[in-house]
């Protein structure tokens, strides 16, 4: 793995130095987001091996790309750099695990081959047939591995019922495709003379359909892993080798790690590998009695399987997804047979039928099964149970089963008891004394959490994006992971990079209080002179003088927060004009220890007069590495450092956390200190500032 990591880091450094000419193959198109995923085959005349992938942005709506096309492009590439917060999906690790360490824009392009891939043409042909169906997005996910069109409501339903795994083409789907073809091949053999019947034809036919299904699904990693396992199993049968399940499992894992060491960064790899391992353990340790192996006990066999998966996979689900679905057992007992034995076979049949009318009818039948399934799943009670920071508790499941099955308790009772007590004591989390400041990494925007004990106040809610916002994507998962109860939201001003996540947070906590200077009758006041006490912290509003409906930068609500020993200044997006008035009005209140850098470090803010008035120690800036304005400005950063501030920003460090107790302050950054993994590095060129 170290060798592959070094190679990918070297390639990032080499390919992002300057604009370069590449020969690329288009791998995926997201027309709505104006993005294409390309495989970098050559840099000028030099082949790139192993090939690297990059996501490219394009501007023109008239430009139509399709997978399979080959282009000569001049690209300005840059290293992937994702937001980094506790509790948020690790996009940077995901990008490196999938060999997509680059992103960029197209400067010039010339088409070398305009032909679209057969897969793309096949998908477009069938998309026209299912365009009128209500479950077309789910059908596309099951048939072609395209999950981008799944609605937020559908994703939520799948998560809450523990059935999301059914929408990712993986081991179950590939094995099912192979099994369907094996049955068809065996049926054909009944029509042949006895001397023509052999065991090879069904095996080879099943592998061909499984490989075709893998190709149609886009060749994503879970499908490839399943095909590799099936290939090994078929090869051992043809060769006459006698390998048990554990031997095939270890052989698959070994081959995967040899061919792609970076796959260890993939959550889907661990889910796939451990799911199969858990099944082997379950059937080895807790097998059904022989009398229940007959077909009439199929429902009992399925129940036995689902119980095993629910128990043994619970620790991994809690660790990766911070929760489990308590309705998963019932939901999967319904969904797995429907998807496995009805929906997927109908989809495979629809794709194989040569006549459009028959194909459309079969698609409609598959859609009907999904409509019925969705209806039944919506009748189940909301089943998602958040379990944050419960990894050690989840390990008790595995440890308990091992101790019970191996009868270790009887041979070493004191050791087992000591381990159990130690694990239970580790759950006694100490509530942190003092108070905390956490600047979340929301990209270009702002969101700061001030917390005492198990309660928190939020200053700004982060930005809104095209299809999502920082409230739902960052703030809520972070608060839930930290088990904090949100008491109040303070909006500095109206701009969407500060208020974009408000609606998502209000949907989660409808009764939450909001404070602002926006002339909103539903909001608490946030104008100069307003002050309140929250536990040991005193809040005092220093600016603006009057409320304003416009909510521009200079109308930002500036607040001083202190415990009598350490003072924090929250500034929103005020600029030099407001800074001068603030210094004139509140100079005695500006002697602070910590300042939130105004307006993301723009040159229009952080004037020399303002900085001299602060006399602080830590400056916190919320910025995105690749923001369009190249903030923070180099001159602003240098001025803070010359004035004696220690500079921290989310673009460089991800989430920034400060613990304050009895006048002492400790700063911890996620990228450098809390999660200092090699794949979280700042790759590529140094900071691009103006």
Where is each model-derived feature located?
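Membrane-interface helix/helix-cap signal primarily in integral membrane proteins
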Residues: 2-165, 469, 473-477, 481-485, ...
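Non-globular, low-confidence helical/coil segments that flank catalytic cores
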Residues: 61-79, 94, 291-296, 351-690
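Aromatic-rich juxtamembrane segments at the membrane interface
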Residues: 97-228, 235, 532, 539, ...
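Hydrophobic alpha-helical transmembrane segments of integral membrane proteins
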Residues: 199, 311-312, 333, 341, ...
